[in-house]
Amino acid sequence: MAAFRPPQFKKSKILAENRRARYEYAFEDFYEAGLALTGTEVKSLRFGQGSIAESYAEVKNGEVTLINANIPEFSHGNRFNHEPKRPRKLLLHEREIRKMQTAVSREGMTVIPVSLYFNNKGKAKLELAIARGKKTHDKRATIKERDWKRDQARLLRDKG
């Protein structure tokens, strides 16, 4: 069985990645969303700060909100600086929001941010995935598969 490959969005500079999510969740569908940010948040992201490791997205009242994402205050900001962990509105088409709403209403499904990046036009984008939490035995299978691939590469390298 071939591995599931997510669609490739045009990413010019990846700012933050949720690498743990690939281990904890099985992804089903991917979306690209814009973020409604303030000026100091954009400046802070351009300096390479920001984390989406413990964040998730919530679909409520026809809107998608990014919860618990950390974008630190801009170092040269003044009294207009932003709150680091405030909820941020995600910009998606209505059709995509409805699809997310129906997917999340099923048991065990959630919306997880996978990566935060600037696209080629300089806009901050967030790659979202509709995901199902993995069970412990699924995580073990992932570890075994990764170890086997590493061993294969080592064997091929040593023989050649």
UniProtKB/Swiss-Prot annotation:
Location(s), subcellular: Cytoplasm
CDD domains: SmpB
One Pfam short name: SmpB
Gene3D superfamilies: 2.40.280.10
Keywords: Cytoplasm, RNA-binding
InterPro entries for this protein: SmpB (IPR023620), SsrA-bd_prot (IPR000037), SsrA-bd_prot_CS (IPR020081)
A cellular component annotation (GO) from this entry: cytosol
MF annotations from Gene Ontology: RNA binding
The UniProt record lists the keyword Cytoplasm: yes
Free-text function comment from the UniProt entry: Required for rescue of stalled ribosomes mediated by trans-translation. Binds to transfer-messenger RNA (tmRNA), required for stable association of tmRNA with ribosomes. tmRNA and SmpB together mimic tRNA shape, replacing the anticodon stem-loop with SmpB. tmRNA is encoded by the ssrA gene; the 2 termini fold to resemble tRNA(Ala) and it encodes a 'tag peptide', a short internal open reading frame. During trans-translation Ala-aminoacylated tmRNA acts like a tRNA, entering the A-site of stalled ribosomes, displacing the stalled mRNA.
Homology family: Belongs to the SmpB family.
Protein known as: SsrA-binding protein
Gene encoding the protein: smpB
